[in-house]
């Protein structure tokens, strides 16, 4: 994707230029490019925005020309976390671009939903209703439309949501709190009911996630076990989101089901890659690194790339590094 008309590097902070150069260079190791991306994401997500915010967003978007589907999908995810309207045009362009990888387009559409701006509804509805689009794109846009409508509704203001341990902007909010104690079997029933709208099922998914954190919460293991059943869902999109949630939770009880998903050669690449990255976040658990190394030469590129990044993340977990990021000089630490 070509940079936008407003994309200029003139007068940009040298740290951002260094990170942008690493991120957009095909000769840099993938793991190093991911670390550069997460450094830029930090600057792009600053609230309130600073003079570094827009150049960081533009630097992230500049890498959409990469041939790596894994990297591009992560770019889209990061832009969706910025809470910044400057990210919208880049994401809309990627979502509409049928030449782009499906996984990348899906993530761009999901990111538009996360940002919540109503001017994305027209594009998302058109993709949702286009019978020539893949199930992954149509399902993603269905959820994104519902999320934007919810975000801008009166009903949202009336809902009481449990405070989450996670700062991520999710594809759907958790189910609203009720007067009674949350019933995991009831939420699980909603999660697994394929007759319900995907947005509602995603709300159940994120409600279960919040009941599984922190890991020593009395409901945690039961919530993880309920979520694991979602890895058998007919929708690849749904299965990949379960794996993503497991990556957030870092709960050891998820390791068997993540290992099974990664090991299944007939599973969709977007699910296997998410399972690999989730295992990377559990890299300090016994046997996880050995499992990941088995797939370094997997036939599927996105799985191989994910394992490289996952092993780098596992190394970071073991070393107890403060942040999974690239620090080119002292300047970024103060940014």
From Swiss-Prot:
It comes from the Eukaryota. Disulfide bonds: none annotated. SMART domains: EZ_HEAT. GO terms for cellular component: cytoplasm; nucleus. Its cofactor is Fe(2+). HEAT-like PBS-type repeats lie at residues 71-97, 104-130, 200-233, 238-264, 271-298. Pathway: Protein modification; eIF5A hypusination. Keywords: Cytoplasm, Hypusine biosynthesis, Iron, Metal-binding, Monooxygenase, Nucleus, Oxidoreductase, Repeat. It is found in: Cytoplasm; Nucleus. Its EC number is 1.14.99.29. Fe cation 2 binds at residues 240-241, 273-274. Fe cation 1 binds at residues 73-74, 106-107. It holds the Pfam family HEAT_2. One of its GO terms (molecular function) is deoxyhypusine monooxygenase activity. It catalyses: [eIF5A protein]-deoxyhypusine + AH2 + O2 = [eIF5A protein]-hypusine + A + H2O. Binds 2 Fe(2+) ions per subunit. Coiled coil: none annotated. The keyword Secreted does not apply. InterPro entries: ARM-like, ARM-type_fold, Deoxyhypusine_hydroxylase, PBS_lyase_HEAT. Catalyzes the hydroxylation of the N(6)-(4-aminobutyl)-L-lysine intermediate to form hypusine, an essential post-translational modification only found in mature eIF-5A factor. Belongs to the deoxyhypusine hydroxylase family. This is Deoxyhypusine hydroxylase. It comes from Neosartorya fischeri (strain ATCC 1020 / DSM 3700 / CBS 544.65 / FGSC A1164 / JCM 1740 / NRRL 181 / WB 181). The gene is lia1.
